[in-house]
Amino acid sequence: MTSTEWRTGLTGAQQAEIRALIDAATTHDGVAPVGDQVLRELGRDRTRHLLTTDDDRVVGYLNLAPAEGDDPAMAELVVHPQARRRGIGAAMARTALAEGGPGARIWAHGNIAAAQAMASSLRLVVVRELLQMRRPLTDLPPVPDTPGVRIATYAGPGDDAEILRVNNAAFSWHPEQGGWTEHEIDERRNEGWFDPEGLFQAFDEQTGSLLGFHWTKIHDASLGEVYVVGVDPQAQGRGLGYTLTLIGLHHLAEKLAGPEPTVLLYVEADNSAAVNTYRKLGFEVFSVDAAYAAN
């Protein structure tokens, strides 16, 4: 018998079950059903957790981040592969949309067939798309010269204020990347993947101010990520985004020891300028994440 309930906090055992559920879905679908932020929230009470159990076994999980300002509530969910086609995902999504309020959205990572079927049954429409683009870390273009710019890696928390200034100026429009505080940097600095040598910064040689940065991430021996590239809007037009991206790609190419090293990145599907820039760097679309909302 299945039952569904909201939880503000999760026990250690529940967190372990949810992680195992996510792993099972990832293996089955070939794409992770939730993003890194959801994993960080499992041990916290900043978001709400909807659990569906079947004979005391967690078969469905949904994370609901509440609306903030102009940004609508955002949900991500996963159903165990062996518990699908029973309406569990649709029921959880319907509950989250009602709880989330006007404009609430549900992310479908990879927008797999099961997610599309659920969205269709609820008459949801795609309101946002995020492209995952990839390219092999071979035959990289050389890094162009940057006169008047000094490149340095992350030196510690003393760099944070400038990184936050540039990040929040570059992503003032972005619902997840914008509005960062020291807390967001602290969270990522405490992650096992964080490497100060993989966070590159471009400084104006005359003023010393930060012009842009590229934060890289290594997933495993064969896969790296362009985690964040941010350029101060007042420094745009100088090719800094291109240069910083290439610096990070060369770094990842040196670090990854796998036989076919690859790099991924995420970019908004409607950001045509960024998509075109990444295509020029050899990236191609690998998968699409879709955010659904009520029509």
UniProtKB/Swiss-Prot annotation:
- On whether Transferase is a keyword of this UniProt record, the answer is yes
Q: What does this protein do?
A: Catalyzes the transfer of acetyl from acetyl-CoA to desacetylmycothiol (Cys-GlcN-Ins) to form mycothiol.
Detail the disulphide connectivity of this chain as listed in its UniProt entry: none
Q: Identify the EC number(s).
A: 2.3.1.189
Q: Does the UniProt entry include the keyword Acyltransferase?
A: yes
Catalyzed chemical reaction(s): 1D-myo-inositol 2-(L-cysteinylamino)-2-deoxy-alpha-D-glucopyranoside + acetyl-CoA = mycothiol + CoA + H(+)
Residues engaged in binding 1D-myo-inositol 2-(L-cysteinylamino)-2-deoxy-alpha-D-glucopyranoside = D36, E176, K217, E225, Y266
Q: Which GO terms describe its biological process?
A: mycothiol biosynthetic process
Q: Give the matching InterPro entries.
A: Acyl_CoA_acyltransferase, GNAT_dom, MshD_Acetyltransferase, Mycothiol_AcTrfase
Write the protein's name: Mycothiol acetyltransferase
Summary of subunit composition and partner proteins: Monomer.
Give all residue intervals belonging to the N-acetyltransferase domain: 4-138, 149-295
Q: Which residues form the signal peptide?
A: none
The source's superkingdom equals Bacteria
Transmembrane segments annotated in the record for this chain: none
Pfam families from the UniProt entry: Acetyltransf_1
> Where along the chain is acetyl-CoA 1 bound?
L77, V78, V79, R85, R86, G87, I88, G89, A90
Ligand binding (acetyl-CoA 2) = 229-231, 236-242, 271-276
Enzyme class, one word?
transferase
- UniProt keywords, alphabetically: Acyltransferase, Repeat, Transferase
Annotated organism of origin:
Mycolicibacterium smegmatis (strain ATCC 700084 / mc(2)155)
Homology family: Belongs to the acetyltransferase family. MshD subfamily.
HAMAP family hit by this protein: MshD
